[in-house]
């Protein structure tokens, strides 16, 4: 199924192109911006149409099992060897990679206020602020969580990440991601995933933008198994959208930045690298609207585990143990009878970084605000504050619909280490643990 998937008309700027999409998750897609640009029945003909070059981009080893084998064939104006000159190492700003040991902050439950929108001009690369790192970028295991603050579009600048795939979670303002596979636009309550090695630039759509970014060093995000849930609900494949081909034939000086091995490098090009006229394969960027997620839950009693809200998972080598789970807490009905309905008190082998896109999170009605974040690291207790506990313990148990809310969680098997920015930026709430002070002793051996 194609959505606005007509061939894209050549423009000197991506602003001349209207995004179009193909639906499905992990499909073998094919798309061309000029008729006949895709070869038929073969991948690398002796001579490609329109004088294009054939190039394969592999996201997995050649010998990976068929179900996990990811690659795309790109038909482009110039091969990527023409997109790399002499690289020079450049400043990473506030972007950090694991392992990162910058701060001796004692272990604790942590929560941050949202960062204010800066007044100075910041492109995407300048606006990334790393909050936590986990695992090791050099062993392709773990992740990093970042905030981004963007006040200026990237102009004649492009980027790709060799260290991991990147999930954008907008909280304020829309983004236009101009990738070599096509163009993706996202707004709050949508996400986009850019695979490692894919070149792109970030443009603003309607003013400054703020949001969250997950950098996945491990296995690519995929849909979780549904098990006894069956064939439907949760995130459905048809709601994921991959862009149709769109290209620039633009001979103007451009900078290409590459994140590799935890460092940032830059080279200068005389042309835009967004020059893929056609492509086919299953390794490509995509977007997803979180509002299409179909949650399941308890319709009798008890509060189920939060894993039922998993949208995407990055598996590890241990079955059932995720490198990263991306989990959301969307609008839903709460109907469980004789049940404490908010998330229960918990100590967990996994480490949880949470953010709030909009609304109120039911376990923390105060202090956890849109654009903010919290971190509950492995084996550190957490749960509802006094206000949430009292309300849930004494309220009438009639069906209640949680509306106007969208929280999310990046959960990993690795401990998440806080960066210097996260510890010292002034956003850290030093009174977060006080939210549990009001939980008094209620035990009475004479009152069952």
UniProtKB/Swiss-Prot annotation:
Its EC number is 1.13.11.5. Hexamer; dimer of trimers. It catalyses: homogentisate + O2 = 4-maleylacetoacetate + H(+). Fe cation binds at residues 346, 352, 382. One of its GO terms (biological process) is tyrosine catabolic process. Belongs to the homogentisate dioxygenase family. InterPro entries: HgmA_C, HgmA_N, Homogentis_dOase, Homogentis_dOase_bac, RmlC-like_jellyroll, RmlC_Cupin_sf. This is Homogentisate 1,2-dioxygenase. GO terms for molecular function: homogentisate 1,2-dioxygenase activity; iron ion binding. Keywords: Dioxygenase, Iron, Metal-binding, Oxidoreductase, Phenylalanine catabolism, Tyrosine catabolism. HAMAP family: Homogentis_dioxygen (MF_00334). Involved in the catabolism of homogentisate (2,5-dihydroxyphenylacetate or 2,5-OH-PhAc), a central intermediate in the degradation of phenylalanine and tyrosine. Catalyzes the oxidative ring cleavage of the aromatic ring of homogentisate to yield maleylacetoacetate. One of its GO terms (cellular component) is cytoplasm. It comes from the Bacteria.
